[in-house]
Amino acid sequence: MKGYWVVAVQDVLKPDAWGQVLSAFENYVEESDGICKPISFAPPAAVYESGISKTTAVIEFPSLDDAVHARTRDSSYFQRVIEADGTPVENKAIRDFRIIETEGGWMKPGHGYWLVWVREFIDKDNWIGKVMPAWQEYVASDACKVHHLKPPHMALEDGRMFPFALCEFPSLQAAIDARESDEYNKDVLGAAGKPVHEMVTRDFRIIEG
């Protein structure tokens, strides 16, 4: 099992200062001797619901402990990277920053991935009671491979302790087609008979491996 930062940038408040953060992060990665390994760091290929077309970062660490340590206790990161200008990271960018644990090796070149950050529950009863059972049937049909679907180990900055979903498809196009399919939109999301945005707010992004 490995640890991951899964980060959805919501907004960049100070582009110049944030650009300096990104440059410093590149140096941090180089100096980490492979401990900190970005496996995706770009805007998503597609967004849905409350998804935002801003940087979507997946950073791999050898273990969950390494991922937590790097973000919370490594001064090389929070002093020399995100707070190098002497101000909190929140002054420069708003990020839904979560730390999760899952098996390594899931990111495969050419495959497509749903990365979904639940930001808020509005009608949790219908979501859990009706939509999630339909989702389980959808997954059981081999529609996709689920690598993570639960709250994170830790949430920081603008992160939330709500479920984070990581689902794999054979290709980017397959991931997009699945998101736009009747099987997902009607049979799963429509299981409660009400619009998704009346039950849950999700930052839904699709990326390519």
Question: What is each stretch, according to the model?
Answer:
Residues 76-94, 183-198:
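Short arginine-rich
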Residues 1-72, 92-182, 202-209:
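Short S/T/G/P-rich N-terminal loop/turn motif that feeds into the first structured element of a domain
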